[in-house]
From Swiss-Prot:
Keywords: Cytoplasm, Histidine metabolism, Lyase, NAD. GO terms for biological process: L-histidine catabolic process to glutamate and formamide; L-histidine catabolic process to glutamate and formate. Signal peptide: none annotated. GO terms for cellular component: cytoplasm. The active site is at residue 404. It comes from the Bacteria. InterPro entries: Urocanase, Urocanase-like, Urocanase_C, Urocanase_central_sf, Urocanase_CS, Urocanase_N, Urocanase_Rossmann-like, Urocanase_sf. It is found in: Cytoplasm. The keyword Transferase does not apply. GO terms for molecular function: urocanate hydratase activity. The gene is hutU. NAD(+) binds at residues 46-47, 124, 190, 236-237, 257-261, 267-268, 316, 486. This is Urocanate hydratase.
Length: 549
């Protein structure tokens, strides 16, 4: 019988404090059927990104958290609880390391050998670090990206423009709503009907069809009427994109969010159904991969042709360019990455995906914090628009949560305000505050977050390690360090942190340090690389950088 996991709600504790109750609830929330892509196999999102190595490990993590003291720390090695040590009340309650390999051995083939032997787990970014909040977790980032495209090329709106993309998984599933929130039209190609149904059920997608002509008719009608619309097409991008080129149908914008970072489990070859692909993947993985590589080449060549014919194209951080390049598409990197093209300046001033979740399970706690963030930053019209859109459009998945992009100084101010609300009893229960690893100073990923750095420091991985250590030193509740998130094994290293606002004076001190230092290092990382906006931000917030003194 399949296990159904959901986080407890309310104020009754299963653990000895909220500092240990929080990681337990968020681990469980990652596996809520409303949240996780494949909870029966502990897979949360992003190909095979897991919350725990196996069910035995999951049970033992929960059991250990229930008995953990306020001066003890649980160590988790790739989803397996390996030790509890006496530390201090300032130390994190949980330290997590997922998927990390010595660089020479950091490739999918060797990783899978270790995974088969039960020695390692792919944690993606927020799957194995227990702070995934459903598709909303990437929604604002996707919204911001398409807004940046609109601002750069189309006068600040996507009205009357259409986007072609593929992949409606837990990350890509944000694309339809992000485009329509920017008043555009999107055709999203997806081969797995379950993913289309999931996006329809969560309100991220308007409609679907399995007929290309019908899909194009809907798209073209909406474009003509300047009416926002999202259409999913049950098909394969490697079949559809070349066909569009052949017909001379060129979108305004083209991107991709298939899970191409993991070609074996995240990409389906052209010319076959999803069910046929699953069968071949299991019976002959080598043949499967050969067909994937052929399909990726067709897929990227079609996007390159669309680019030549005027489409604005970008890779959305799934490493599909590298995959195509390795299999013969030598101009694959003519497609720019989305971070240097649209997001870098936000990162340079410390803005990134700040998120929080209501441990009570009560949506009112989130609505009250929504109100608070707007009170604190009344000058930010873009933030107000986002919160209002999110309240109208975003359905809860698991524990109620919110995401918004806040910068240096803002995160700490808001975190302290939340803690005060908990202290005064304005919220039913404590709030957990975290972020995606995809943030300003917590990732080294030369094909995504750190692509085309001004000083050429794309592959320098000291920064995410410093980020993890700094968050430990500052008092985060749990801290994680992962390998391979977003772009796949061998291509990224990244750190995450989560902190609990439980209304105590100790939490106040920790929040002030963690939410200042975590993002502060991101500003420092970009200032060190020579970005003027980061240097100005560092000076404005009195960040001490000896080499700039």
């Amino acid at each position: 019988m399949e296990r159904i996991i959901r986080a407890p709600r309310g104020t009754t504790l299963s653990c000895k404090s909220w500092q240990t109750e929080a990681p337990m609830r968020m681990l469980m929330n990652n596996l809520d059927p409303e949240v996780a892509r494949d909870p029966a196999n502990l897979i949360v999102y992003g190909g095979t990104g897991r919350a725990a190595r196996n069910w035995q490990c999951f049970d033992k993590i929960v059991e250990t958290l229930k008995t953990l003291e306020m001066d003890e720390t649980l160590l988790v090695q790739s989803g397996k609880p390996v030790a509890v040590f006496k530390t201090s009340e300032w130390a994190p309650r949980v330290l997590i390391a997922n998927s990390n390999l010595v660089p020479k051995w950091a490739n999918w083939e060797y990783f899978r050998e270790l995974e088969e032997r039960g020695l390692i787990m792919y944690g993606q970014m927020t799957a194995g670090s227990w702070i995934y909040i459903g598709t909303q977790g990437i929604l604002q980032g996707t919204y911001e990206t398409f807004y940046a495209v609109a601002k750069k090329y189309f006068g600040g709106t996507l009205k009357g423009k259409w986007v072609l993309t593929a992949g409606l998984g837990e990350m890509g599933g944000a694309q339809p709503l992000a485009v329509t929130l920017n008043d555009g039209v999107v055709l999203a190609v997806e081969i797995d009907k379950r993913m289309i149904e999931r996006r329809l059920n969560t309100g991220y997608l308007d409609t679907w069809t399995d007929n290309l002509d019908e899909a194009l008719e809907m798209v073209q009608k909406a474009v003509k009427e300047e009416r926002p619309l999202s259409v999913a097409l049950l098909a394969n991008a490697a079949d559809v994109h070349p066909e569009l080129v052949k017909r001379g149908i060129i979108p305004d914008i083209v991107t991709d969010q298939t899970a191409a970072h993991d070609p074996l489990t995240g990409y389906v070859p052209a010319g076959m159904s999803f069910e046929e692909a699953l069968k071949l993947r299991k019976e002959n993985p080598q043949k499967y991969l050969e067909l994937v590589y052929e399909s990726v080449v067709k897929h990227i060549n079609a996007i390159l042709e669309m680019q030549k014919q005027g489409a604005k194209v970008f890779e959305y951080g799934n490493n599909i360019r590298r995959l195509a390049y390795d299999h013969g598409v030598k101009d694959a990197f003519n497609i720019p990455g989305y971070v240097p093209e649209y997001i870098r300046d936000l990162f340079a001033e410390g803005k990134g995906p700040f998120r929080w979740a209501a441990l009570s399970g009560n949506p009112e706690d989130i609505y009250k914090t929504d109100k608070k963030v707007l009170e604190l930053f009344p000058y930010d019209d873009h933030l107000r628009k986002w919160i209002e859109l999110a309240q109208k459009k975003v359905k809860w998945q698991g524990l109620p949560a919110r995401i918004c992009w806040l910068g240096q100084g803002e995160r700490a101010e808001f975190g302290l305000a939340i803690n005060e609300m908990v202290k005064k009893g304005e919220l039913e229960a404590p709030i957990v505050i975290g972020r995606d690893h995809h943030d300003t100073g917590s990732v080294a990923s030369p094909y995504r977050e750190t692509e085309a750095m001004k000083d050429g420091s794309d592959a320098i991985a000291d920064w995410p390690i410093l980020n993890a250590m700094l968050n430990v030193a500052s008092g985060a509740t749990w801290v994680s360090f992962h390998h391979g998130g977003g772009v796949g094994i061998g291509y990224s290293l990244h750190a995450g942190m989560v902190i609990v606002a439980d209304g105590t004076d100790l939490a106040h001190k920790k929040l002030e340090r963690v939410l200042t230092n975590d993002v502060g290092l991101g500003v420092v990382r970009h200032a060190d690389a020579g970005y003027e906006i980061a240097i100005e931000t560092a000076k404005k917030h009195n960040l001490r950088m000896p080499m700039l003194d």
